[in-house]
Amino acid sequence: MRFLSKFFSLIAFAMFCTTIFSANAEAAPSIKYRVTHVRLIDQGELEVQGYFENEGDRDAYAKCITLDLTLIADNGQEMWSNSGIEHYIDVYVPADGALEYTFYVQDEEIPEYHGKFRYRWHTHTNWDTSAG
């Protein structure tokens, strides 16, 4: 009888812990901006094309993209590089969804270049669950 009492107490405690800890595992958004193409517009300006992807299970708003970008000429020479480029926005991204987004970077150091080039990038996206 004593064993049965301990067994049921253990089961009740396990159910209690499961209820408490599962309530804390709240749904959360996870938004990332991915660069798909970089295009040189003119000397001093480039266009960054990409999309936001929300891998979470809750809707949210992308607030800021921080971009590190390096342009590399066809011959392997670095043409331009900048890190910490911030672009502030307020864009709705649905849960498990994606949204195309293009923005422009202006910097007098961006060269005018008409040949082929490649690019390396890294982004960090800040988001919030409310607009504004």
Regions found by a protein language model. Give the residues of each.
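Terminal connector regions
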Residues: 103-132
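Bacterial N-terminal signal peptides
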Residues: 9-19
